[in-house]
Amino acid sequence: MASIYRRSSVLIALFTVTICHAHAAPVTASSDFFSPEGRVVTQASYPTDETSRQTLQTQSVVGVNRFQHNRKLTPTDDQPVVRMNRDTYYSRAVVDVSEGATITLPDIPEGKYMSVQPVTEDHRIQPMSYGPGTFELATHTGSHVYLIVRLDATFSEEEAARYQDQMSITAASDKMFKAEPIEPESFEQIETELKAKTPMLVKRDGILALRGGFTAPTDESRGLHDEDKYQIMAAGGWGGAQWKDNIYEISGTYPSDVCHQATFEDPANSAFWSFTVYNKAGFMFSDVANVSSDTATSNADGTYTVSFVCGQDAPNNLPTANESGEFTLAIRHYQPSDRVREEGYRLLPFVKPR
């Protein structure tokens, strides 16, 4: 009798596993990614799950080994990720690198910004490559990478489109990316929990809060990797760049009806710096959402003043009124200077009420 019971238990277990595997059949379309029968998301799995979601979204629009070009700077009604910006035009692609692949970027005028950043299936961030050229693509895991190409925002839309159309991908394989479906409620819960940890991170680590969140296991950034930051930043800033490529400053909240200003010395980054205004949840709410060293007017002494709801005559003024009643800031240093990266020079401490 015991023998029969054991065999029955084994059969039941096998049957259960079979049912679970049937529910977890990999999908290639974003519309199939969330399923009530999908795998439950954990904080440990979230970076990979969010990367799968982003990858499937792009693949569902343009397929594999093809670009999805944003012909305009990020509009307020199309922000798939928190803390997007209008610092650059974006192009995205899902590339099958299983049998080798390259991306080719065109010649652009000297002094203009263009970069490509590969993101692996587990949201490990490879270093950027800059300017024109052909760049090899590879990954330490899986078969696909997600590419983020950034192009200088000072180009007109017509100029940007012309350069975007000269970008090309060459790949020896064109298999679609596949991902295991996930259970939506657990995804939303974990994402909310991780985003809520960002203020704690900033309070605890100060100017080093985001260091270690965007790294790769295949280069020198591996030594900076921090598992907690890796999970938190996948929710709070998916697709962010390595420390050597971009340094981010994320603020707390400010009242949206109080004038604030920051006057500071130019950090002299190799590319540029920028301020972007968001609502409390981290989304842009105005078409006038940012100012950068490429667009800001400097003071007579060479410093810069950036203003927030201080009146039209205030230097480099940005609106802050939004439904949440509060605003937040993200300051970005593209190709940060040694003063920023090594000496800890930051602009956020200069933001003060007036």
Predicted feature residues:
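Gram-negative bacterial Sec-dependent N-terminal signal peptides
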Residues: 4-23
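A compositional/structural signature for long, glycine/proline-rich flexible linkers
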Residues: 24-354
